[in-house]
């Protein structure tokens, strides 16, 4: 009886540690599934650095503003090369923004993206520039060594 309680306690502690390990910032507060009306839908282009370009259409991107003039965005169900075996949701946190009328101007450098529950340091986001209006979103950044652009509309 005593051993069963110890095993249960250890199992509970292990589950708690695993749950805490999966917490990695604001990205857990973003919508798990995009809502069609709130997401931008567009094309993402990734320069493969071998003279070819990989294009993925119908990419959904959503964002969340924070009070400290940063935002997070999520690119849903994306892959960055035709040989990539699966699609993933990529979260980019801590993008700086400024506001001019109804336009947000974005910038960021040295941002580690999250995907599949963990950080992807190899694909650190650098030279991020972009803009968001009520109807359009445009992004340009380096994802590791790969130049990426995105253009979407609502």
Predicted regions and their residues:
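Bacterial N-terminal signal peptides
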Residues: 10-19
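Flexible, membrane-facing loop/turn or short amphipathic-helix motifs
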Residues: 42-53, 79-86, 113-121, 141, ...
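Short, exposed beta-strand-loop hairpins at the edges of beta-sheets
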Residues: 128-147
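Bacterial Sec-dependent N-terminal signal peptides
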Residues: 2-5, 18-43, 142-154
């Amino acid at each position: 009886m005593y051993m069963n309680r110890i095993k249960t306690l250890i199992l509970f502690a292990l589950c708690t540690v695993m749950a805490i390990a999966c917490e990695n910032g604001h990205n857990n507060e973003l919508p798990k599934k995009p809502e069609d009306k709130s997401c931008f839908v567009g094309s993402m282009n990734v320069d493969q650095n071998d003279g070819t370009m990989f294009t993925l259409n119908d990419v959904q991107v959503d964002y969340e503003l924070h009070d400290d003039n940063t935002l997070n965005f999520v690119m849903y169900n994306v892959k960055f090369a035709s040989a990539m075996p699966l699609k993933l949701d990529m979260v980019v946190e801590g993008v700086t923004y400024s506001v001019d009328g109804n336009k947000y101007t974005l910038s960021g450098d040295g941002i580690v993206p999250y995907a599949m529950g963990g950080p992807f340091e190899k694909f650190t986001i650098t030279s991020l520039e972009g803009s968001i209006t009520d109807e359009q979103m445009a992004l340009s950044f380096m994802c590791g060594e790969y130049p990426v652009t995105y253009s979407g509309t609502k």
